[in-house]
């Protein structure tokens, strides 16, 4: 991975701009504040509102840490959040207002793949950086480019990784060893995208790919369609909460094949009827950064999914602004990969002041955040490890760890 050094950045900015920025540095809070924006489903349905509230607090915490560490070139940071209502059209309006009124150095969000996908073209046209904590859609890897630069990033894994894990569960002799399979997927942007990538990755013959509506009261029909070809395995793609009724229907059938569940559906409290099913699970490291953030948000324990990713999204953007010496979206987008990894000095949650000192001394940074190692690729996304797990009477048991190299080396563990 090539990452631009600070010396290269200052050279790219130019001598005149660098001199002007140097004159602003160290004027403790004297300049106008800089803004981090966020687009979150604060009034979204079901558990989305609670998830968004935790994400909002995580971003607030990253901003607080930045201000405690001296801000960006001596300028305070403020966080301005807008409610997307989990609706792409509402999100587009709120994005336009946020970008025009606040000129944020970065916008954390959106949360949902469908909402993020709807904004990528406009963000690229505006040269406005979006950093999503939870958009896993594979298409985001190539979206949001303008004039040779990428303006859409994420701190969560690409679902192409999850597809590779689910395909391994279906195909591998250690697990389902299936010659034939069907896919049963939730009919939304996330489910359809993951189903498409999984279909391409499967070695087993795909007999059917069946959509279902999230929260459906009549799960029998889709399950009938998925089981009708008598597959050796069913790959089930769903979302927490809205898919549980369909899983219950599936596992309640007299079906002798194996079931592979997508990530975040199974837990230690899943019903005994789910036992035997396999699941793909992101390998979440509990690092110093993880523990620090959980302490900072201790009244919200347990944290909603992707809360750590939301902190990392804001923290990376703020570090990139400090590193580049230029708190504009274009400069921050260009420096994001540089501060996320490499051979620099390791920093973590709450280390913004130390990071600023290192930057001032001409040192490189390597951010190991609330989610652990966040090394971003040229697509501005991390490659993380996954676990293959199985539900048993004893709970969820890990069968295999697939390290990040499994995905970068073409599937060789």
Curated annotation (Swiss-Prot):
Gene3D superfamilies, sorted: 3.40.50.2300
Topology versus the membrane: Peripheral membrane protein
InterPro entries tied to this protein: BCAA_transport, Leu-bd, Peripla_BP_I, TAT_signal
Keywords noted in UniProt: Cell membrane, Chemotaxis, Membrane, Signal
Superkingdom in the source lineage: Archaea
Signal peptide: 1-31
A Pfam family reported for this protein in Swiss-Prot or TrEMBL: Peripla_BP_6
GO biological process, alphabetically ordered: chemotaxis
Subcellular location: Cell membrane
SUPFAM superfamilies named in the record: Periplasmic binding protein-like I (SSF53822)
Annotated protein name in UniProt: Chemotactic signal transduction system substrate-binding protein BasB
